[in-house]
């Protein structure tokens, strides 16, 4: 069943409810009720599925007393959920405004949602993401090229990134970055110059990012997609970057970390096996903790090395697919 917004925007009831419950409608989170976290949403989703409503969309027409009686929520929880579910007018206008800048929202109830996020993160996958660009790129094999802003990229690092970008284009891998100044912006420029596809996953500033020259060009050419879990006008923060990197590591076959401040979730990705092939560049001393915890060292990549590495990734992906077939 579809629910039509006041401006003619169509969403399934489940998708609509997921956005109402979890989406911040202002960048500074000034809301009548605080949107649900992913963990909170999963709990409400499970309760709805176990109830006579059958799914999350069935809650759209339930009053506060119904939420208390049939889901077993407290009065405070029920009021919060009810308030969030009745932001439909504000949500419709907010989505229409975003669409004017080429931004839409996709939920786990939509076919366009990246399947790898659900497969890898499972219950921790975000209920929705903001998206712009060519969504078909999200299903391509991909590598991440990562670094933090404020660290100078020397000629040797640039040459290594060139080899990765060239190899990715040659073998049909998208290149994923975090969109920050430094390694990410250099990588995006090389993709634009040398060929291939780019996926930027942001920790803030989505609307402004889409207007940068390189990204605007790649979007116009159908060679880029941009994702974010944050309001398009939200500022970049370290906490947003940590949440962003969970998506990065879940979406890629391999990640190449050129530099880090140690606060971007790389160690968690290693510990949780979110990304089985995480490489750390030996040319940056700050990568030592990653190397000590099991990241694979790399330095001095040569033309052709990418082809050998991706054979290992392909075998890992095939093994994972076989496991999913058995579930």
Where are the regions a protein language model picked out?
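Glycine-biased, small-residue-rich flexible motifs in mid-sequence functional cores and linkers
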Residues: 2-30, 93, 101, 108-327
């Amino acid at each position: 069943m579809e629910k039509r917004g006041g401006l003619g925007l169509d969403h399934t009831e489940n998708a609509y409810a997921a956005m109402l419950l979890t989406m911040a409608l202002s960048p500074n989170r000034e809301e009548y009720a605080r949107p649900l976290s992913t963990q909170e949403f999963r709990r409400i989703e499970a309760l709805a599925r176990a109830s006579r409503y059958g799914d999350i969309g069935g809650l759209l027409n339930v009053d506060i007393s119904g939420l208390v009686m049939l889901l077993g929520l407290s009065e405070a929880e029920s009021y919060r959920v009810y308030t969030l579910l009745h932001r439909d007018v504000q949500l419709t206008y907010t989505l229409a405004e975003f669409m004017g800048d080429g931004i839409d929202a996709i939920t786990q109830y939509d076919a366009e949602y990246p399947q790898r996020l659900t497969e890898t993160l499972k219950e921790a996958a975000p209920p929705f993401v903001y998206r712009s660009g060519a969504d078909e790129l999200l299903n391509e094999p991909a590598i991440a090229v990562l670094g933090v802003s404020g660290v100078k990229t020397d000629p040797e690092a640039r040459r290594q990134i060139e080899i990765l970008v060239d190899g990715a284009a040659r073998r049909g891998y998208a290149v994923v970055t975090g969109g920050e100044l430094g390694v990410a912006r250099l990588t995006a420029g090389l993709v634009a110059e040398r060929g291939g596809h780019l996926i930027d996953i942001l920790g803030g500033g989505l609307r402004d990012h889409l207007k940068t020259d390189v990204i605007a060009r790649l979007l116009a050419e159908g060679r880029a997609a941009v994702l974010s879990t944050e309001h398009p006008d939200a500022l970049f923060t370290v906490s947003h970057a940590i949440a962003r990197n969970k998506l990065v590591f879940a979406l890629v076959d391999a990640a190449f970390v050129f530099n880090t401040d140690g606060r971007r979730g790389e160690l968690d990705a290693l510990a949780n096996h979110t990304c089985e092939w995480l490489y750390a560049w030996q040319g940056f001393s700050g990568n030592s903790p990653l190397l000590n915890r099991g990241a694979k060292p790399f330095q001095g990549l040569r033309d052709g090395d990418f082809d050998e590495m991706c054979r290992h990734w392909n075998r890992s992906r095939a093994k994972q697919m076989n496991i999913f077939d058995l579930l």
